[in-house]
């Protein structure tokens, strides 16, 4: 009875939703990327219902588009791209994951994941490399023109420690879970579900901190 009285408070709030990854990239020339997996984490002490919505449902097949995640567990959601055509290159689609408590209908929280179809991974890498070079040249020119040793301003961007922690959390989420038999990764690098839940929670906090800077 005490838990039922707390449900309206949960409904009124904006419950953080932990999903990895937050971006899906499909490559037309690599069929292995046409099927990707979203992992929904539930670090809470109550079960969550989830529902996956999409801005262009005719382009994708979502396996288990609705279901439930037990407390302190995770759920893999398989997404397949079924309309790989050149006219869709570069178009940004969005998936929205809505979660609610099992006894409630109103969404407690939501998370958006963007999806993009690109022609080739090699072309994407080339474009990213060219972009990085241009950004590096622009930054170098800016510092050469405006650098003043006696009156430098402190950067408001994320610290190296924050970036390092984010990389560690992302790496932890990408490592296999305990019980994955087919993985080639050594067993001592397999993490438990609880460890991944902690990593997802910390990554969420870091992301919010970065957006506030």
Curated annotation (Swiss-Prot):
Its main location: endoplasmic reticulum. The chain crosses the membrane at residues 159-179, 191-211. Disulfide bonds: none annotated. One of its GO terms (biological process) is negative regulation of transcription by RNA polymerase II. It comes from the Eukaryota. Pfam families: Motile_Sperm. A motif (Nuclear export signal) lies at residues 205-208. Keywords: Endoplasmic reticulum, Golgi apparatus, Membrane, Transmembrane, Transmembrane helix. Plays a role in differentiation and/or proliferation of mesenchymal stem cells. Proposed to be involved in epithelial-to-mesenchymal transition (EMT). However, another study suggests that it is not required for EMT or stem cell self-renewal and acts during later stages of differentiation. This is Motile sperm domain-containing protein 1. It comes from Bos taurus (Bovine). The lineage of its organism: Eukaryota, Metazoa, Chordata, Craniata, Vertebrata.
């Amino acid at each position: 009875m005490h838990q039922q009285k707390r449900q309206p408070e949960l409904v009124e709030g904006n419950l953080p939703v932990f999903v990895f990854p937050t971006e899906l990239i499909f490559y037309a020339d690599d069929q292995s990327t046409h099927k990707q997996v979203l992992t929904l984490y539930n670090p809470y002490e109550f079960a969550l219902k989830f529902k996956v919505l999409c801005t262009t449902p005719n382009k994708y097949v979502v396996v288990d588009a609705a279901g439930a995640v037990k407390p302190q567990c995770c759920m893999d959601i398989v997404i397949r791209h079924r309309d790989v055509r050149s006219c869709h290159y570069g178009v940004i689609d969005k998936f929205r994951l809505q979660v609610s408590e099992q006894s409630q209908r109103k969404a407690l929280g939501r998370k958006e994941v963007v999806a993009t179809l690109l022609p080739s991974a090699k072309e994407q890498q080339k474009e990213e490399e060219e972009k990085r070079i241009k950004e590096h040249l622009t930054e170098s020119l800016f510092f050469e023109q405006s650098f003043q040793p006696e009156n430098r301003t402190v950067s408001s961007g994320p610290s190296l420690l924050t970036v390092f922690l984010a990389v560690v959390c992302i790496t932890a989420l990408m490592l296999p879970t305990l019980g994955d038999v087919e993985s080639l990764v050594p067993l001592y690098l397999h993490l438990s579900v609880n460890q991944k839940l902690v990593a997802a929670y910390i990554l969420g906090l870091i992301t919010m901190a970065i957006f506030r800077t």
